[in-house]
UniProtKB/Swiss-Prot annotation:
It comes from the Eukaryota. Keywords: Tumor antigen, Ubl conjugation pathway. Residues 1-55 are annotated as: Disordered. Gene3D superfamilies: MAGE homology domain, winged helix WH1 motif, MAGE homology domain, winged helix WH2 motif. This is Melanoma-associated antigen F1. One of its GO terms (biological process) is negative regulation of transcription by RNA polymerase II. It comes from Homo sapiens (Human). Residues 76-277 form the MAGE domain.
Length: 307
């Protein structure tokens, strides 16, 4: 979910009287500035010359601060992803997880940010992997994971094997596609997985082989469409929503999912929000037409004419 570089200082233009002599051979009377002692003129130039240098120095300081913030943000995101994987691995043994373990093995010198890191990790665990992070012993800061995520529809539970984490992964991919204008390059999907701490081609204890899950299950079940991008050499491929996702999952649901991960309201993304509202209206009209058709057929079978 870009900062513009700060403008750099420009040299201060010379005053009219400081420019080289007249125009077209015209002789001008000495100005007040020309009559000043050389020492004064030199001092004035030094003061004027220092101003753009200070401006450049300030711009460099601002750029350095912005770079430091970006690095800190990237490190925080990386720590959250590593903590999520650590908690999932620890949960395989069904043993409680202590705060001291998290700090020792993952968080390290960022322990002052523990409340924010654990809160963000809990959001990812819930909405992506289907687990609720619960603190059951406040005195000793001990946590456990509980499988809590409910699929959107009962039919989806059957199609996805009743697997909350797989549904969470699908929602992440659908969200990426939607936020990028309804298509996402294959490389962008794999990069998103890596940011979650999931290697596409390596075995993951929740997803199996993620790349195989996406290409063989999600694509074949028509949750995702996969096609070559025209006019690309070497060839590139992209994902989009498949027909099954368009039927079973609304854009507003996916936008709400993304908003929860970022702790924002869906209106934070006005373009996607307007598109989701239009999609909701289309679905409501289609549902009304289908219900009217069903009532008409039922009335016809019963021999009742409504009009």
């Amino acid at each position: 979910m870009l900062q513009t570089p700060e403008s750099r200082g420009l040299p201060v233009p010379q005053a009219e009287g400081e420019k080289d002599g007249g125009h077209d051979g015209e002789t001008r009377a000495p100005t007040a500035s020309q009559e000043r002692p050389k020492e004064e003129l030199g001092a004035g130039r030094e003061e004027g010359a220092a101003e753009p240098a200070l401006t450049r120095k300030g711009a460099r300081a601002l750029a350095a601060k912005a770079l430091a913030r970006r690095r800190a943000y990237r490190r925080l995101n990386r720590t959250v992803a590593e903590l999520v994987q650590f908690l999932l691995v620890k949960d395989k043994k069904k043993s409680p997880i202590t705060r001291s373990e998290m700090v020792k093995y993952v968080i390290g010198d960022l322990k002052i940010l523990f409340p924010d890191i654990i809160a963000r990790a809990a959001e990812h665990l819930r909405y992506v992997f289907g687990f609720e992070l619960k603190q059951f012993d406040r005195k000793h800061h001990t946590y456990i994971l509980i499988n809590k995520l409910k699929p959107l529809e009962e039919e989806e539970e059957e199609d996805l094997g009743g697997d909350g984490p797989r549904l969470g992964l699908l929602m992440m991919i659908l969200g990426l596609i939607y936020m990028r204008g309804n298509s996402a390059r294959e490389a962008q999907v794999w990069e998103m997985l890596r940011r979650l701490g999931v290697q596409p081609s390596k075995y993951h204890f929740l997803f199996g082989y993620p790349k195989r899950l996406i290409m063989e299950d999600f694509v074949q079940q028509r949750y995702l469409s996969y096609r070559r991008v025209p006019h690309t050499n070497p060839p590139e491929y992209e994902f989009s929503w498949g027909p099954r996702s368009n039927l079973e999952i609304s854009k507003m649901e996916v936008l709400g999912f993304v908003a929860k991960l970022h702790k924002k309201e869906p209106q934070h993304w006005p373009v996607q929000y307007r598109e989701a509202l239009a999609d909701e209206a289309d679905r409501a009209r289609a549902k009304a037409r289908a219900e009217a058709s069903m009532r008409a057929r039922a009335s016809a079978r019963a021999g009742i004419h409504l009009w």
